[in-house]
């Protein structure tokens, strides 16, 4: 079985990306947010998602057999969405500082450590050219 985990930062598009991949016939979509696939898988692929990026996704052997898809989105739209959802009262976990740290962490593991099976997609590019960016990853 091939496992796929989608992560990024809240309101970057993890849910919609998981749904798009989950609609592929050979993919079993894990409905609830999780950072590890534990349930029985009946299809060739399984996809899960979590809105937050954690360093152990890259450094722990528990995720070494996962295809890791990191999704980013223009921070203007991320924080417009977060402000709307939280009535302009964003907590520390959803702060611009955490957004920046998330971007730095991904850059470190993808480009400095060169962790295999790690991919980057921009939310703004998902739908272009009949999902071409996503097809390039999968």
Model-derived regions: residue spans:
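PAPS-dependent sulfotransferase catalytic domain
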Residues: 51-138
């Amino acid at each position: 079985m091939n496992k796929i985990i989608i992560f990024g930062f809240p309101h970057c598009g993890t849910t919609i990306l998981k749904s798009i991949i989950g609609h592929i016939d050979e993919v079993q979509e894990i409905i609830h947010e999780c950072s590890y696939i534990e349930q029985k898988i009946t299809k060739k692929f399984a996809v899960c998602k979590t809105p937050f990026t954690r360093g152990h996704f890259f450094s722990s052997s528990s995720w070494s057999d996962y295809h890791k898809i990191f999704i980013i989105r223009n921070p203007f739209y991320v924080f417009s969405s977060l402000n709307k959802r939280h009535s302009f009262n964003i907590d520390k976990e959803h702060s611009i500082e955490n957004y920046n740290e998330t971007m730095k962490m991904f850059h470190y593991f993808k480009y400095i450590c060169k962790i295999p099976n790690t991919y980057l997609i921009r939310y703004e590019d998902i739908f272009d050219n009949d999902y071409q960016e996503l097809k390039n990853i999968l």
